[in-house]
Amino acid sequence: KIGLAHLNSETGLKTDNLSSQLSQHYSFQTVDLSSPINADIDVYLVSGAVDSLDSLVMDNLIAIMDSGKKIFLTQSGILTDIKTQQANPIDSDIFSFLKDHGIILKQNLVLDGKSSKVQVQERRGIFMMNRPMDYPFFPIIQSFNKDEIVVSDLEQVLPFFPSEIQIDTASIDRVAGVIELFKSSSNSGLMEGNYILSPDPQQ
């Protein structure tokens, strides 16, 4: 059984598309991580935090990991808004939780030459026209681990504003092993510090 949880208290959990996909093969329910853990749930799909966590939520995340159950966490190091073209590092204790389990999520953004496009308005005479432009902050992932069933049948994934992940296998004894599921292309790079989110370099 799968539990869907949301760490961002400022926005609601939007699961319509995900729920329709999961319902074809799995039993699932939304869960509140500030409430007692449901022993029937084997895997938790958890959306990312944008602020520090309630102590009950943190205690439950630790208890879930210590019990041997699994957490699939979608977390970025940077809070972004494409409409205002603003980006700021996220200040949250979720990063210390991840680091305690050997995962170092960097506060940067991954860019990739193989990316999706966004529509940019430009003036042509008296008219405003939409023009598609490559947007490297939306990398197109096409490199998957074919030996892992969770991603082996995927053809493409499009993450929005992903951050770099480093795995500490030396100093953390909780890391039994690391399996790479997918990765960006060889044309990828990083943006740190001064975040320029405009898709049009002339703006």
Residue ranges of model-derived segments:
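N-terminal non-catalytic structural scaffold regions of very large proteins
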Residues: 1-2, 10-11
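Acidic, S/T/G-rich, low-cysteine, solvent-exposed domains in lumenal/extracellular/periplasmic regions
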Residues: 11-203
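Short beta-strand/turn micro-motifs composed of small residues
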Residues: 4-6, 75
